[in-house]
């Protein structure tokens, strides 16, 4: 098959920064290519129009058209034209796009369009308990209604999305994936005792403002505990504060703060090094669809304490391959971290079970086959 992915982001030096959507598309593209399918990646919002081929994947960098009042519509029509040329010249079979801001709301190419839920703006605003922009919800709803087929990375995201948009349609559930070969624990490096790692954007919805209160409880019990924070610092929508990190700092107890290191954004490879050497990884998030960061840490056989909200049980089995605790239950969350810091055997057990779960459910081979089988059904 010949498949195109339309995306606002992709983890490539030429494409700018990327989050979970880009990472999941990158992994799926590699899996499909390895299985013999031809993949095109169309990245809009770029600084220039460029086409290049790398590792058997054809990339289209697409520059948005900017004319006041018509930018979105004209950019959509430009994308539609590119897709139709791929159909004409390369026999493209279908195009897949994320639900985020409904980019395909006015894109009607001469092939099936698949929408994969990684979490729309409407979805995240709902989880964040804040209002969604009217136009964003309008375009997201229209894109979902117009799609020929719908996928979701988790049951939870599918059910919440159906309620929010009053959709009477079924979703095929296919999770995000990772390349297990790229995420394995390097035992030769060893790990640093008593290190607690959080990697991801510093932002309210990821539980960043709960982390200081959780770590204060850990530090009371274990004065050797160290919290390492990795990721870009985001502004806070509710308070209009330009820095979540600035908001976090006063929440730490004075002594505990001395054991906190914020390293900002680091390279993908460097993140893997920090995962490898950490004792425990923590993810006290309030809003996700299906977090790639959890899967990456589990693949590297790390003991995890994560949020118990919604999607969580589709990734982690509580007490089997990690602990699940509500982010605002600070004392209990801290107790689980302390338990793992003090119990090497339990950390090892969780790590073994975690990687086993990832291999069975979230490897690029498994997810690429599920996706390809789904695409074939659409094309029949």
Q: What does each model-found stretch correspond to?
A:
Residues 77-78, 111, 123-142, 180-184:
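Nucleotide-sugar donor phosphate/pyrophosphate-binding loop at the beta->alpha transition
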Residues 156, 177:
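Carbohydrate-associated surface elements
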Residues 189-206, 212-215, 227-230:
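Conserved donor-binding/catalytic core segment of Leloir-type glycosyltransferases
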Residues 241-266:
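Nucleotide-activated donor-binding/catalytic signature segment of Leloir-type glycosyltransferases, i.e.
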Residues 265-266, 273-278:
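Short alpha-helical donor nucleotide-sugar binding micro-motif in glycosyltransferases
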Residues 286:
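Aromatic "clamp/platform" in nucleotide-sugar-dependent glycosyltransferases that forms part
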Residues 303-306, 316:
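Short hydrophobic beta-strand element within catalytic cores of glycosyltransferases
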Residues 318-319, 323-330, 339-345:
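Conserved acidic donor-binding segment of nucleotide-sugar-dependent glycosyltransferases
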């Amino acid at each position: 098959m010949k498949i195109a992915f339309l995306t606002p982001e992709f983890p490539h030096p030429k494409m700018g920064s990327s989050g979970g959507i880009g990472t999941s598309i990158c992994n799926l593209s590699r899996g499909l290519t390895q299985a013999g399918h031809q993949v095109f990646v169309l990245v809009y919002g770029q600084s220039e129009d460029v086409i290049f081929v790398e590792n058997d994947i054809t990339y289209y960098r697409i520059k948005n058209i900017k004319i006041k009042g018509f930018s979105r519509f004209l950019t959509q029509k430009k994308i539609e034209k590119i897709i139709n040329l791929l159909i004409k010249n390369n026999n493209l079979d279908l195009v897949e796009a994320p639900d985020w801001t409904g980019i395909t709301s006015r894109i009607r190419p001469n092939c099936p369009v698949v929408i994969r839920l990684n979490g729309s703006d409407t979805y995240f605003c709902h989880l964040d308990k804040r209002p969604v922009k009217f136009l964003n919800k309008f375009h997201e709803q229209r894109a979902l209604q117009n799609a020929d087929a719908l996928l979701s990375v988790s049951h939870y995201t599918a059910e919440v999305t159906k309620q929010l948009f009053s959709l009477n349609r079924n979703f095929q559930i296919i999770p995000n994936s990772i390349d297990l070969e790229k995420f394995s624990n390097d035992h030769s490096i060893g790990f640093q005792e008593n290190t607690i790692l959080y990697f991801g954007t510093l932002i309210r919805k990821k539980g960043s403002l709960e982390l200081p209160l959780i770590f204060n409880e850990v530090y009371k019990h274990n004065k050797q505990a160290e919290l390492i924070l990795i990721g870009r610092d985001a502004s806070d929508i509710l308070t209009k504060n330009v820095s979540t990190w600035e908001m976090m700092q006063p929440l730490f107890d004075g002594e505990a703060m001395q054991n906190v290191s914020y390293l900002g954004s680091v390279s993908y490879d460097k993140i893997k090094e920090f995962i490898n050497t950490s004792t425990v990884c923590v993810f006290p998030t309030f809003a996700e669809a299906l977090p790639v960061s959890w899967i990456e840490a589990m693949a590297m056989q790390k003991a995890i304490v994560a949020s118990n909200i919604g999607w969580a049980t589709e990734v982690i089995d509580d007490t089997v391959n990690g602990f699940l605790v509500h982010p605002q239950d600070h004392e209990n969350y801290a107790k689980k971290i302390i338990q793992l810091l003090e119990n090497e055997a339990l950390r090892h057990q969780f790590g073994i079970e975690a990687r086993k779960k990832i291999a069975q459910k979230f490897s690029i081979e498994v997810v690429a086959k599920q996706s390809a089988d789904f695409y074939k059904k659409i094309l029949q």
